[in-house]
């Protein structure tokens, strides 16, 4: 049977987020491998006590809640997660920033198209006015030594985590629209 426009858009969006997630994993891995073992242990301890800016975005807490969420809800959460990275991604180094910014913008546009295609008169962001993300810590200030190291670590770890979430949500949403799919996580 022919592929629908919605399925095609989902395939493109999933491919884009997979690419971003792999990039996030590589950047995080490269950063970790540049650290001394002691530095890495310290950063891991600190990060476990901290949280990501995007934790303010209400999203499913486990795979069961993800499975029960509507396609539109998963798309809206994905959109917010991607949007929440537009500003923080600018604080990365030049090459990383260029790689990520364009990909985020493309992914955001793709998710917007998917939301429009899947809306049944539902409001896209019923509670978006309540979503006011605080600036991403001190990422935009020039930081010295250990603080800068910690911020880079947190930024890359959170970016990796959020791209994994978006990838999961888009894959579940895509699966739901596929007639013969078994959508288990």
UniProtKB/Swiss-Prot annotation:
GO CC annotation terms, alphabetical: extracellular space
BP-aspect Gene Ontology terms: animal organ development; growth hormone receptor signaling pathway; positive regulation of growth; positive regulation of receptor signaling pathway via JAK-STAT; response to nutrient levels
Location, primary (coarse class): secreted
Disulfide topology: 52-158, 175-183
Binding site for Zn(2+): 167
Subcellular location: Secreted
UniProt-listed InterPro entries: 4_helix_cytokine-like_core (IPR009079), Somatotropin (IPR034975), Somatotropin/Prolactin (IPR001400), Somatotropin_CS (IPR018116)
Listed GO MF terms: growth hormone activity; growth hormone receptor binding; metal ion binding
Keywords attached to this entry: Disulfide bond, Hormone, Metal-binding, Secreted, Zinc
Function: Growth hormone plays an important role in growth control and is involved in the regulation of several anabolic processes. Implicated as an osmoregulatory substance important for seawater adaptation.
Family: Belongs to the somatotropin/prolactin family.
Record protein name field: Somatotropin
Source organism per UniProt: Katsuwonus pelamis (Skipjack tuna)
């Amino acid at each position: 049977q022919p592929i629908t426009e919605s399925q095609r858009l989902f395939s493109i969006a999933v491919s884009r987020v997979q690419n971003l997630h792999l990039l996030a994993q590589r950047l995080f891995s490269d950063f970790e491998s540049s650290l001394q073992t002691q530095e890495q242990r310290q950063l891991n301890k600190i990060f476990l006590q901290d949280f990501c800016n995007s934790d303010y975005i209400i999203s499913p807490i486990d795979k069961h809640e993800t499975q029960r969420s509507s396609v539109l809800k998963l798309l809206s959460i994905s959109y917010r997660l991607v949007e929440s990275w537009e500003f923080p991604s600018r604080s990365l180094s030049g090459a990383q920033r260029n790689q990520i910014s364009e990909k985020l913008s493309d992914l955001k546009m793709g998710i917007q198209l998917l939301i429009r295609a899947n809306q049944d008169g539902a409001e896209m962001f019923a509670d978006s006015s309540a979503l006011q993300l605080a600036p991403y810590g001190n990422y935009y200030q020039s930081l010295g030594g250990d603080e800068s190291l910690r911020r880079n670590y947190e930024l890359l770890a959170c970016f990796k985590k959020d791209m994994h979430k978006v990838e999961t949500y888009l894959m579940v949403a895509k699966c739901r629209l596929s007639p013969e799919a078994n959508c288990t996580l």
